[in-house]
């Protein structure tokens, strides 16, 4: 890619190297530990589904039983495979027997590791084949209809009722949206289980459940076939159930997933040890399922200043890239996040926003960057808000951002109406059409505001990453370097669900999926 900013590539390399060292150091911790939700995700991928009479998901029943008997370090795959050999039951029947109190995994006579792997392999292969078929179907649609060039128009629905969401999502797709994100109900990231079935009551969003995923996927396929284009579905595998929701998304052919441990640590007070382990398995699954992940750097600028803290966003992007690579993800799946969140009362902020967006594009040339619209300084004045969104759209097309979450002029007033989305889509389409090639016509002068801003942010980010390399990720978070939010290593939610792996532990899905993409 031609550089318009004349970035110091040596600094880029130094930053990337520091981030890789931080990720590799953290990976040593990850490799030694598992968590309750990692093992519940293994249960789900082994075909354990449904809830008991008390509406407790059966994966929770199995893993809670393993925690209560101090058996979780063995891992769900080993324990269930061993029980399959002893009882002749499949994983679902094993889970149901545990729920009835008929089976204690910790008391089942131990079979050899070779026998256990042989017993569980056909089940693993069946799940992997289901994911392969999902990826093949997505690829088939894209081959038939082609994929969109330029930014994806990305909108959200958030009614709380999946059936109402479907109506709004289909309307948005017909209006021109390329990605539909179903916002989760407020606080779902703090639930240490995944609700079951179709849901009609949520607050600020709709519960992420596998049935809701299935219903929305079918609805978007229906409208996609009418429109002769593939409509991507987005949801959220952040919080205390990251890998479980990633597994559900892989099984139901979701295309985009919000996925960022740092977001959960900083903004949901989830324990850092817990969520960094959870993130790894969730990214292995997303990588294999061909899912684009979205990271949450844009949120830093809601609690910190977008001008003075811009380097923390870039540093986090480097870290998220390194963690994604360690999970075997391709750069084309790394939707690194940033945002148009500077105070419009400050002079030349459009130039600063343009500089930072172009900088991200040049540093991460293969990444489908996720660009977020203004929210912090939206006042409820819909006329000014529409102009702010237009300026955001201009930066999007000038710098070739890929996932463009459309701003709403009614931001800070109410959840968008369908008419609000229609106007937002029209705004973006107008600007993207009339400015399609303007970016390639522009150059930025040496020692000008734009180049100097990019140099400043890159230099500060590189220095910060060198500091993080010395401190380690956990200490960095404790110091409040990201988003001006401090979190203790042993605080937050979910630490009790982290255990050290036994020597016999294995996760067959990491072995099969890591570094690969289904149907390729």
Predicted segments, located by residue:
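Glycine-rich phosphate-binding active-site loops on the catalytic face of alpha/beta enzymes
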Residues: 178-189, 252-269, 320-321, 392-415
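Alpha-helix-loop-beta-strand connector modules within alpha/beta enzyme cores
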Residues: 143-144, 194-232, 276-293, 350-367, ...
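Conserved, well-structured core segments that form the ligand-binding/active-site neighborhood
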Residues: 202-330
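Long, compositionally biased, glycine/small-hydrophobic-enriched stretches that function as flexible linkers
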Residues: 1-163, 171-176, 184-212, 239-245, ...
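Hydrophobic faces of well-ordered beta-strands that scaffold small-molecule active sites
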Residues: 151-158, 179-183, 229-237, 256-261, ...
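Short, glycine-rich nucleotide/cofactor-binding loops
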Residues: 156-162, 347, 380-385
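Catalytic cores of alpha/beta
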Residues: 163-170, 240-253, 308-309, 383-397
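Hydrophobic alpha-helical bundle architecture
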Residues: 353-420, 438-448
């Amino acid at each position: 890619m031609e550089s318009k900013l004349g970035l110091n590539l040596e600094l880029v390399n130094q930053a990337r190297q520091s981030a890789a060292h931080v990720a590799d150091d953290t990976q040593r911790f990850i490799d030694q530990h598992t968590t309750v939700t990692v093992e519940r995700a293994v249960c789900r991928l082994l075909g354990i589904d449904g809830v008991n009479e008390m509406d407790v998901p059966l994966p929770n029943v199995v893993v809670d039983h393993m925690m209560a008997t101090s058996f979780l370090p063995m891992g769900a795959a080993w324990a269930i495979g061993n029980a399959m050999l002893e009882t002749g039951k499949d994983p679902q029947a094993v889970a149901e027997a545990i729920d009835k109190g008929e089976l204690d995994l910790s008391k089942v006579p131990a079979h050899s590791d070779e026998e256990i792997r042989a017993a569980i392999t056909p089940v693993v292969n069946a799940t992997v084949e289901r994911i392969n078929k999902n990826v093949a179907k997505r690829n088939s649609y894209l081959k038939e209809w082609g994929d969109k060039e330029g930014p994806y128009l990305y909108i959200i629905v958030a009614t709380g009722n999946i059936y109402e969401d479907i109506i709004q999502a289909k309307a948005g797709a017909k209006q021109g949206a390329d990605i539909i994100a179903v916002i989760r109900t407020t606080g779902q990231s703090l639930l240490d289980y995944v609700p079951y079935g179709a849901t009609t009551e949520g607050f600020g969003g709709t519960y992420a459940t596998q049935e809701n995923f299935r219903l929305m996927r079918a609805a978007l396929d229906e409208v996609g076939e009418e429109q002769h284009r593939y409509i991507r579905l987005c949801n959220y595998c952040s919080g205390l159930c990251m890998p479980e929701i990633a597994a559900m998304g892989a099984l139901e052919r979701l295309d985009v997933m919000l996925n960022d441990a740092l977001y959960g640590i900083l903004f949901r007070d989830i324990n850092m040890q817990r969520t960094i382990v959870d993130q790894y398995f969730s990214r292995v699954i997303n990588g294999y399922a061909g899912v684009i992940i979205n990271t949450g750097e844009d949120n830093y600028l809601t609690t910190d200043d977008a001008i003075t803290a811009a380097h923390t966003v870039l540093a986090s992007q480097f870290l998220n890239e390194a963690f994604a690579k360690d999970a075997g993800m391709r750069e084309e799946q790394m939707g690194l996040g940033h945002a148009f969140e500077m105070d419009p009362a400050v002079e030349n902020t459009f130039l600063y926003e343009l500089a930072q967006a172009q900088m991200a594009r040049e540093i991460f040339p293969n990444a489908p960057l996720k660009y977020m619209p203004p929210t912090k300084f939206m006042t409820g004045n819909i006329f000014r808000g529409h102009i702010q969104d237009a300026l955001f759209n201009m930066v999007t097309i000038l710098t070739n951002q890929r996932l463009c979450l459309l701003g709403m002029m009614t931001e800070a007033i109410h959840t968008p109406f369908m008419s609000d989305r229609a106007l937002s889509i029209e705004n973006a389409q107008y600007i993207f059409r009339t400015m399609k090639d303007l970016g390639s016509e522009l150059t930025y002068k040496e020692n000008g505001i734009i180049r100097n801003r990019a140099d400043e942010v890159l230099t500060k980010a590189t220095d910060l990453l060198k500091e993080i390399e010395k401190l380690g990720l956990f200490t960095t978070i404790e110091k409040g370097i990201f988003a001006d939010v401090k979190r203790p290593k042993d605080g937050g939610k979910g630490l009790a669900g982290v255990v050290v792996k036994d020597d016999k532990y294995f996760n067959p899905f990491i072995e099969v999926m890591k570094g690969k993409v289904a149907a390729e």
